[in-house]
Amino acid sequence: MKRSLSPLILTLIFVAMHSPALAQDLTRWQASLTQPQDYVLKRVSSADPSGGNADFRPIEPGGTLTVLDVDGPALLTHLWFTLYAPARHHLKELVLRMYWDGERTPSVEAPLGDFFGLGLGDYFTWESELLSVANDRALNSFFPMPFQKHARITVTNEGREKVPLFYFNLDYRAYSKTLPADTLYFHAQFRQAQPNPGWTNQWQVNSDRLVEEKKNLNGEGNYVWMEATGRGHFLGVAMSVLQNQDGWWGEGDDMFFIDGELRPSINGTGSEDYFLGAFDFGRSSFSYRVFGAPVKGEERAGGRSSVYRFHFDSPIPFSKSLRATIEHGHANHRSDNYYSVSYWYQSEPHGPFPPLPPVDQRIPRLQPVGGPGNSVAAPH
């Protein structure tokens, strides 16, 4: 037997000594993998029922494909989708919905691309702990999604062209015992502002005195990520921005209004700060486990950016209600387009979601808002 430790073991010891967080992850995985599991793992997929290789389903215009329809108690652990669709805007035209325990209104409703962080309607690769987009057009979700009685997940084609090939694999843990009575259910809500209604277009740069002197203490006019009633906790958001004006879009502060408060008990210092970057993200893209800016566009009209953050360290709890918001520019002076999906867990029933905009209104387009870089003035 060799007396020296293998390079792999040495590496693991070094990482454990110098990275406590990663060491905790290793310990957690080791404990989980060495214990008997109390579930049966099941999968629902688009596999060819004949045993052939046509492992896909088509979705006709106006049609709805049910990708999951199973009884609980269970925990959905992984969703994988990929597709071929000729329509240019299919990521905005396909709508993902999830229903738990026989509810009539979905707990998840979002364009397919937006749910997976592709809020500008284009594919790009990125990875995080809970969502990723891999080569080539592979959409992955690892959000744990429990249900006590039943789960139904659908994909609806609101476009005008057929989706010829839609593939899916969904893995879930089936349990023999009921889930705890206080189990919270997964929710995701799409919102957009095309454009955000900035309060002025009479500015040249974000630091103009007119802008700097404006105050915003109560979140009036903020872009709303989500609103919820009941008990739960906010986990995070993926957001995309199409700039209608020149300059840095991210001067806005995040504000969380918990349980009906009039002043936010959680108030941030800037958009890139909330998404755990700094100083315009250094004008470069990045993608980490729980935060990132995988798309960082130029700071001008037409610039496109995508960002995300998950509150793994401390999900934001609420007992009665939550209103999660962010300014669009300082005190809401900018008029850029925002597209977002927020993710949270809460008790059922949930409050009503805002109506999903018609598909043609979900396509990202520059808007005539006036201001720097925007040639058409809008009334203010």
Question: Locations of the language-model features?
Answer:
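Positively charged n-region of N-terminal signal peptides that target proteins for export
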Residues: 1-4
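Bacterial N-terminal signal peptides
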Residues: 7-18
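Sec/Tat signal peptide C-region and signal peptidase I cleavage site
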Residues: 19-23
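Beta-strand-centric surfaces of beta-sandwich/beta-rich domains
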Residues: 24-380
